[in-house]
Amino acid sequence: MKEWLRALCYGVLIWGVTGLIGCAPIEPLPPPPSTPVSVSTFTNAAGKWAGILKTIPPLKDDDWVTLMIRNDGAYEFVSVRTIGILHGKGTFTLIDGKLKAETERGWVLGMLYEEDGRRMLKVIGASKDGTQYAADLAPTK
């Protein structure tokens, strides 16, 4: 009987500690940057960016995409997908303070946002088959 009571006490103790930890306040993530920044040179957006690539309309799973932009506007991207790897490269042009590229497979438009020292590259695009894509990319190393 003592073993049963001891097990019950440990169970209640573990349940109580778990409840306290689960109810601890969690600091929310700051909202993504919302102030648009005009891209005047490719160096403003150069670097490595990464984030979740979403399709519109949504497919079963979202994919992770990494985009590398060089100082001359050349770019390469790789998306690790559940059905394989999607990759490509090209060169951006600057139009109205935004990054734009068009290839035989589709088009993409990139807009830079900045706020409180944080940056985000919002990318939208579409493939020639009509599939639309969107991603909010953050700088990465």
Predicted feature residues:
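C-terminal motif of bacterial Sec signal peptides marking the signal peptidase cleavage site
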Residues: G19-G22
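Short, surface-exposed coil-to-beta transition loops
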Residues: L59-V65, I85-K89, E104-L109, D129-A135
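Bacterial N-terminal signal peptides that target proteins for export
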Residues: M1-V12
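Edge beta-strand at a domain terminus
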Residues: E27-V37, L86-D96, G125-K141
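An anionic, turn-rich surface loop/hairpin at beta-sheet edges
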Residues: R81, G88-G90, I95-D116, V123
